[in-house]
Amino acid sequence: MNDGKYPTGRAMTVKEGMTRSLNTISAQLLKQLTPQKSYEFMTQQLGFKLVDSRTNEDGTVQSDIDLAPLALGALTDGVTVREMAGGFSTFINDGVYGGTRTYTKVTDSEGNTIMENTPNTDKGFTNVRTDYYMLDCLQNVTAHGTAYGIQLDGVETGGKTGTTTSNTDIWFCGITPKYSGAVWVGYE
């Protein structure tokens, strides 16, 4: 992808753009997919609570259906750490969005199951290649990119870093073969 405006002045893959955390790559990809389709996928398939359209008291209209909110994270109301961890879980679950769960099951002192939290099995990605490619991109970020060093001995890791202007918000969303998680530092 290249329209001549990237900092490198050359074409590059989505994988390299993610590894180097180049926002222009995300924006160009979203432009091709369309903000509307991406918004629908995030809200309908991944359970994100985003703003379709809202008119403020001063008459200004806000919407998350645009490039800056979806490609760069400039969402009207933001997202929760739980939503991000849930979204990233699809990459380690063959494209299936299992919802977010705080626990898997609760047992009593004798091992009897009292409660079980069964995951949702709705499909997130309809194309398994998309899931595989995203997993590969995320693993490359921890192996060679902005999240280099976030590795565990003997465990495959992947993830994505994110920051806002002046580092007022800092994110890391990560995955291992069994778990996904997200960390946010902000409000400063």
Question: Each predicted region: which residue ranges?
Answer:
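Active-site-adjacent helix/loop patches that line small-molecule binding or acyl-intermediate pockets
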Residues: 1-50, 63-93, 139-140
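A penicillin-recognizing enzyme superfamily signal
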Residues: 16, 78-188
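Polar/charged alpha-helical tracts
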Residues: 40, 44, 57-60, 109-112
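Surface-exposed patches in mature extracellular/periplasmic domains of secreted proteins
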Residues: 50-69, 99-103, 145-152
